[in-house]
């Protein structure tokens, strides 16, 4: 299998259909019915459980009620046809035409370092830089050694900002002092910069790559550019497509967004730019469509697997979100070669969702304790001691991870699976701690809550799942690093826990679930909800900067591993923008994003 390759070639096309975790589909297997892209009727499911073991009023009064909407997508993706010849046609053109064209430009001695860095930035924006990682790293390593000379006379804000972004993304800590040249005698950014709209937008994006050590200048740049861009976006002097581009950036900047979503938007923007490179534009479109074909195949596999589990009908207390669970896996790695990794992450995530929902929204504390105790034993025989719904959850967990183990063991990735088992047990213990607090009516301090909440956030687990299929990374040192609880993973855990608690606060309070980050912060510090939320948001921003700092300072971990961590940090705003819990209620913006990636190919 070609999972570990840096780029794909024609010879790797068949691997998607060869692995046991993938479902080979054809039009005859899944005939297309008359389907609509309109969401299904969203009748909410309210469940009050009964069990064989007890029907006492005391037991049932201690059981939560659940209110989740059914899946928007159902079995839709089983009906979407994929033509294998389209894979071949796109890959052939990329290999024979597109890649040689770009590679020639990257290695040409006629192009300056500045020109090459601007080209690299464009490749990143179009979502095609991953084809040229070795060339890019070679160019940037050499250019960074000559950085002072390269930027000595440079006074173009857009160019400096682009270089800042590219170098930092590739772990070269270009100093934010490079922006001092754009300050006036009063020490503030010059007002004359406002006329350079492209430079202002690029500085705004670059400012999101700041670290704790360069906080002042980056925060000033972010505030300065945002204030002026908000005014400029309504200006009639700016072309409509550029005004829309600014508006998108102000809504969610690219470094708090998924790479594939950035590329999808940027391709449309770039097509409207005067003097755009037709070959690069076509490359971006072909690459996106090629990725999309992989995603559809993967969704077929996952939809069929999830349908076979029959969890929604057996456990309506579990959120039926297989498509929404798969979608963020594109945030970790969107490249075609990571198909296996995305399927593994999606399966692991949905079983964690099932465990969480049962413990959080259905089981009484004694039942949750029995389930988690059985999970710790990791023994299929333990299911006989559990009520029916707990048996379903435990069997789902054990069988899914067993399936992954059978897939990865021949690849020499057994340590990955054992770490996954250990982390799943740890997650279960943390869920049980929350269940115990709820059953006792105990309100922990914020510090107590975060000790458990950082575990239930599951960012360690999500990062771990992403490592499983990274076959080009040596297992032993990778998991030694993981076991050391590195600062970057701690920051991700805090970042997720805080963002999640802010957006789920109202839903949880309406269900009577008072143990959350917002409430515990209010309780410990004696502040209002609004004050608590503001402090938590500041804490989240600070931890994002820690992630960036660690990306730039860690030298003994392969860059692809650290990029997975950065990509995790980029996910949160996609699901938590403006206080909406998009995963639980995916009927608005998240549905539109999913549609833009999976449903609509880009016309070439």
From Swiss-Prot:
It is found in: Cytoplasm. Mg(2+) 2 binds at residues 356, 360. A motif (DDXXD motif) lies at residues 356-360. Its cofactor is Mg(2+); Mn(2+). InterPro entries: Isoprenoid_synthase_dom_sf, Terpene_cyclase-like_1_C, Terpene_cyclase_plant_C1, Terpene_synth_N, Terpene_synth_N_sf, Terpene_synthase-like, Terpene_synthase_metal-bd, Terpenoid_cyclase/PrenylTrfase. GO terms for cellular component: cytoplasm. Keywords: Cytoplasm, Lyase, Magnesium, Manganese, Metal-binding. Its EC number is 4.2.3.-. Disulfide bonds: none annotated. Binds 3 Mg(2+) or Mn(2+) ions per subunit. This is Terpenoid synthase 30.
């Amino acid at each position: 299998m070609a999972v570990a390759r840096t780029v794909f070639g024609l010879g790797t096309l068949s691997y998607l259909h060869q692995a046991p975790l993938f479902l080979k589909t054809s039009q005859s297997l899944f005939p297309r019915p008359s389907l609509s892209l309109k969401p299904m009727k969203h009748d909410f499911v309210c469940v009050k459980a009964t069990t064989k073991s007890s029907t006492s009023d005391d037991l049932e009064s201690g059981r939560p009620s659940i209110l989740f909407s059914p899946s928007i997508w159902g079995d839709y993706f089983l009906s979407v046809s994929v033509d294998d010849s389209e894979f071949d046609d796109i890959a052939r053109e990329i290999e024979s035409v597109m890649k040689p064209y770009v590679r020639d430009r990257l290695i040409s001695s006629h192009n300056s370092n500045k020109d090459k860095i601007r080209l690299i930035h464009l490749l990143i924006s179009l979502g095609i830089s991953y084809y040229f990682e070795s060339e890019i790293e070679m160019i940037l390593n050499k250019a960074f050694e000559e950085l002072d000379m390269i930027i000595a006379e440079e006074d173009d804000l857009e160019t400096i900002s682009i270089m800042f972004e590219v170098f930092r993304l590739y772990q070269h800590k270009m100093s934010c002092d490079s922006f001092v040249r754009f300050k006036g005698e009063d020490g503030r950014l010059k007002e004359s910069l406002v006329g350079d709209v492209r430079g202002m937008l690029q500085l705004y994006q670059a400012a999101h790559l700041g670290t704790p050590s360069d906080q002042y200048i980056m925060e000033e740049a972010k505030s300065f550019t945002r204030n002026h861009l908000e005014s400029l976006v309504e200006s009639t002097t700016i072309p409509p497509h550029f005004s829309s581009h600014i508006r998108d950036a102000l809504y969610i900047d690219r470094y708090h967004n998924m790479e594939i979503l950035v590329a999808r938007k940027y391709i449309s923007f770039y097509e409207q730019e005067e003097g755009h490179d037709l070959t690069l534009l076509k490359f971006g479109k072909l690459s996106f469509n090629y990725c999309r074909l992989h995603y559809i195949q993967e969704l077929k596999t996952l939809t069929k697997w999830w349908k076979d589990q029959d969890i929604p009908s057996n456990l309506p207390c579990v959120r039926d979100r297989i498509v929404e669970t798969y979608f963020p896996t594109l945030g970790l790695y969107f490249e075609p070669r990571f198909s296996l990794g995305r399927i593994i992450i999606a399966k692991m995530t949905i079983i964690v969702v099932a465990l969480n929902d049962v413990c959080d929204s259905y089981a009484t504390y004694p039942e949750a304790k029995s389930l988690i105790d059985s999970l710790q034993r990791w023994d299929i025989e333990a299911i006989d001691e559990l009520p029916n719904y707990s048996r379903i959850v435990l069997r789902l967990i054990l069988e899914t991870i067993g399936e992954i183990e059978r897939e990865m063991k021949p690849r020499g990735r057994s340590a990955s699976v054992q770490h996954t088992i250990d982390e799943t047990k740890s997650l279960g213990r943390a869920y049980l701690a929350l269940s115990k607090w709820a059953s006792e009516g105990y309100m922990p301090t914020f510090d107590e809550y975060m000790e458990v909440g950082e575990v239930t956030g599951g960012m360690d687990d999500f990062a771990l799942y992403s490592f499983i299929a990274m076959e080009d990374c040596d297992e032993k040192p990778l998991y030694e690093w993981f076991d050391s609880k590195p600062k970057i993973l701690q920051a991700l855990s805090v970042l997720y826990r805080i963002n999640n608690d802010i957006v789920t606060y109202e839903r949880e309070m309406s269900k009577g679930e008072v143990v959350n980050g917002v409430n515990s912060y209010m309780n410990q510090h004696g502040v209002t909800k609004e004050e608590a939320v503001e402090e938590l948001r500041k804490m989240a921003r600070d931890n994002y900067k820690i992630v960036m700092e660690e990306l730039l300072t860690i030298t003994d971990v392969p860059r692809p591993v650290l990029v997975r961590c950065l990509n995790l940090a980029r996910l949160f705003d996609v699901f938590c923008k403006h206080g909406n819990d998009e995963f639980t209620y995916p009927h608005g913006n998240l549905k539109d994003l999913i549609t833009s990636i999976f449903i609509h190919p880009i016309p070439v």
